[in-house]
């Protein structure tokens, strides 16, 4: 029942997979990162759209149940799962695991956990649908920066990096600064989440971070399900490297810059 509810909710979430594949249509080999993969919906959707392209997928999550959820996906060739948190340091951090509404709010950040309206409303939904009275639990997990992960695994270029980490966006960017500045990622799909009263400050800071590093925001969509009955707001943003925008493979695509 929980998994069915997750897929129903996910169906109404913003979808960027077709846009991403259209951008990369001339690429024959792809390296894709799915950070905060949970049940692997993003990776599975991309796989269906890839046709005959060669690929390598690197999936990341720190929910101990995820490996079970994506067991069939991991049977495929060139799919690599990493039970580690992407952050701004290499070491350990505390993970807030949402047991009552597992597919949302679990993060190194306490942003969602601390939003009383979000927690109360989702607990009510969970209790009605699943008879679930669980809470958040906290436990230590391993962390690594994107810069270190690429260096350690000798990855020179990433075609797509999807990031869904429920409030830890600053930490991700701090740990990926070298990678982004050196133009090692063509496309970044980043969920930006924050409190409604300070969201646009965070949003503008992140958009400006990418602008300074020569990335263009070409598409964005608000996640209405996050804002409903909460003090939170979330927007999915699709950034593309300016270098790749100017390349031959992107020349005939008609995307406009999004006003920040």
Regions found by a protein language model. Give the residues of each.
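Phosphate/nucleotide-binding beta-alpha loop and adjacent structural elements of enzyme active sites
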Residues: 1-260
């Amino acid at each position: 029942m929980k998994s069915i509810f997750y897929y129903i909710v996910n169906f109404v979430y913003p979808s960027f997979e077709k846009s991403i594949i259209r951008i990369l249509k001339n690429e024959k080999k792809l390296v894709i990162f799915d950070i905060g993969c949970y049940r692997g919906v993003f990776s599975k959707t991309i796989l269906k759209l890839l046709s005959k392209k060669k690929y390598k997928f690197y999936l990341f999550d720190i929910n101990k149940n995820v490996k079970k959820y994506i067991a069939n996906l991991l049977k495929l060739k060139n799919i690599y799962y990493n039970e580690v948190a992407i952050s701004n340091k290499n070491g350990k951090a505390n993970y807030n695991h949402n047991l009552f509404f597992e597919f949302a709010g679990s993060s190194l950040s306490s942003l969602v956990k601390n939003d009383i309206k979000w927690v109360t409303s989702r607990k009510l939904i969970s209790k009605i649908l699943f008879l679930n009275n669980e809470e958040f639990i906290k436990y230590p997990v391993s962390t690594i920066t994107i810069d270190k992960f690429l260096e350690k695994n000798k990855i020179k270029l990433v075609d797509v990096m999807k990031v869904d980490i429920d409030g830890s966006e600053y930490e991700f960017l701090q740990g990926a600064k070298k990678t982004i500045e050196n133009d090692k990622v063509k496309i970044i799909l980043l969920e930006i989440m924050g409190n409604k009263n300070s969201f646009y400050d965070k949003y503008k800071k992140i958009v400006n971070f990418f602008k300074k590093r020569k990335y263009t925001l070409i598409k964005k969509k608000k996640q209405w399900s996050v804002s409903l009955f909460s003090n939170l707001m979330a927007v999915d943003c699709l950034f593309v490297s300016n270098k790749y925008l100017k390349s031959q493979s992107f020349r005939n695509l008609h995307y406009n810059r999004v006003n920040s």
